[in-house]
Each structure stands twice: as structure tokens, then as C-alpha cells.
Amino acid sequence: MNAKIRAYVALMKLRVVELLLITTVPVMMLADRGMPSLWLIAVTLVAGTLAAGSANTINCYVDRDIDQVMGRTKRRPLVRATVTPTEALTFGIVIGIVSTLMFGLLVNWPSALLADGAIAFYVFVYTLGLKRRTPSNIVIGGAAGCFPVLIGWSAVTGTVGWSAVLLFAVVFFWTPPHFWALAMKFRDDYAAAGIPMLPVVAPVEVVTRRIVGYSYAMVAASLALVPVAHTGPVYLVSAVVVGAWFLAEAHRIDRRTRRGDDPRPMRLFHMSITYLTLLFVAIAVTAVV
């Protein structure tokens, strides 16, 4: 029984969910211009975890054929037959329904609709539509990971404001550099599975140039938040400092690639997580000072 429970938890990919939820609470604080009720935060986080877990579980169900090919994913529960495909799909659908009801009945229905939209986008647009067909898969499909900022804002206000849209843009432009760095490291895995990630189908110099381009767009979106959300000097200084750090790392990986050196892409991958965390911590601080 414990093995089965662990398998269901693994299907939800909670380490990925953690990163998504890092953005939710600061956005709720910014929308509230203070600290929302702990009850609202708790319900939003639990329901958001279930929504993301639902999308991830259904993704594992759809991708079980390629997961057994990739070294990075071959120990997932469906590959090891810890749970059956039917059990996994049922679990994913059930927790998605629970998430919708929690958002709708305990938060508000706009947030429920956004959560459902995130699940549908990730499953149908990214997993079933783009992932195996185009190197733009993560560029377009990555929008699913941006929904938590919209949900966080909506949970507090019942609407989606321009500040939330800009933060959506920050995460949207952050996603390609983050995942392309990972795909550079595991290029052979993706190639063996037939997934046309950009590092699989394009020269590495093209990949690193695009990483630099998306990094500038991300930093620009983060700075545009200052006049729109009136975030003040604490956020401005933080966004400039961590943005400059990210751009320096993006240029470093591009330079090393052009020199023919090992680009060490996982360095960018890990620091991108730190960047996003620090930026949203600055948003949280701004909301309460």
C-alpha cells in the first residue's frame, strides 16, 4: 500500500509543483497589497497542487511509451508498473475534479476555470498536440506553467489584472531558457524518444542565441511590472540585480558554446530556479512593506 501511495505522489511530480507554487503566494500578496487570509492561501495552494498534479499525472499516462526510453524518466511509476495506466488516468481525472470543486466552492469560480484551463492546455495543447511534433513545444506549451500567477491573482480579486498578465509573461519567457538548458543536458534522451526539443533539431549555437533572446524578454517583462504594479524600489533593485545575473549566465553559456567549450547547461538550469524564487520573494516583500 505504501508503495502504491508513493507511486501516486510520484505521478504528480511534486518537485515541479513546488516551483509553480513559489509564484502563487507572492502574487496573492501583491494582489492583496498585504497578506491574504491564511485560509485562502492554504486552499489555493492545496487546490493548485491538485490541479498541477492532475496535469502531470495525465502527462505521465500519455507519455508512458517514451518515458521507458529516456534514462531521466524510466523509473516513473507507469514504466515500473507500480500502478496501471487505468489507475493513473483515473487518479489524474479525480484529483483534477477535486481541484475544480475546491477552487469553485472555497475560493471562486474564475480561479476554478483558470485551473481547468491550465490542465486542459498542458494535456491537450502541450502533451498531445505539440510535444512530439514541433521544437516550439516548450515555447507554446510552457504557457501552462504560467497559469499559477493568474490563479493566485484571481483567488484574491476574482479577476485577472495587468500585473498578473506581466508576471505571466515573466514566467512565459523564463520557461524556454530553463527547459532548453535541461534539454541540452539530456539531448540524447530526447532524441532517442523522438521528442523534437530545440537542442535535438537545431545546432547548439542556435539554442544558446535563443536562450539569450528569451532572457532579455523575461527581464524586460519583470521591469515593466514596476510602473504597472507600483512595486517600488525594493522590487526594482531586486529585479535589476537578479536580471543582470541571469543575463550574464545566458551570455556565458552562449560564449562557451561559440568557443567550442562545454556550455555546462545545468548551471543555467539550476540558477534559473534561484532567479525565479528570488524575484517572487521580492514581490512578496514589496507587498508588505
Swiss-Prot record:
> Which biological pathway?
Porphyrin-containing compound metabolism; heme O biosynthesis; heme O from protoheme: step 1/1
Q: What is its EC number?
A: 2.5.1.141
Q: How does it sit in the membrane?
A: Multi-pass membrane protein
| GO CC terms, sorted | plasma membrane
- The answer to whether UniProt assigns keyword Cell membrane to this entry is yes
**Keyword presence, Transmembrane:** yes
UniProt keywords, alphabetically: Cell membrane, Heme biosynthesis, Membrane, Transferase, Transmembrane, Transmembrane helix
* Gene Ontology molecular functions: protoheme IX farnesyltransferase activity
Specify the superkingdom: Bacteria
Which GO BP terms, alphabetically?
heme O biosynthetic process
Write out the transmembrane intervals.
Answer: 9-29, 35-55, 89-109, 110-130, 138-158, 164-184, 188-208, 228-248, 269-289
Compartments where found? Cell membrane
Catalyses: heme b + (2E,6E)-farnesyl diphosphate + H2O = Fe(II)-heme o + diphosphate
Task: Explain the purpose of this protein.
Answer: Converts heme B (protoheme IX) to heme O by substitution of the vinyl group on carbon 2 of heme B porphyrin ring with a hydroxyethyl farnesyl side group.
Similarity comment text for this entry = Belongs to the UbiA prenyltransferase family. Protoheme IX farnesyltransferase subfamily.
Misc note? Carbon 2 of the heme B porphyrin ring is defined according to the Fischer nomenclature.
| Descriptive protein name | Protoheme IX farnesyltransferase
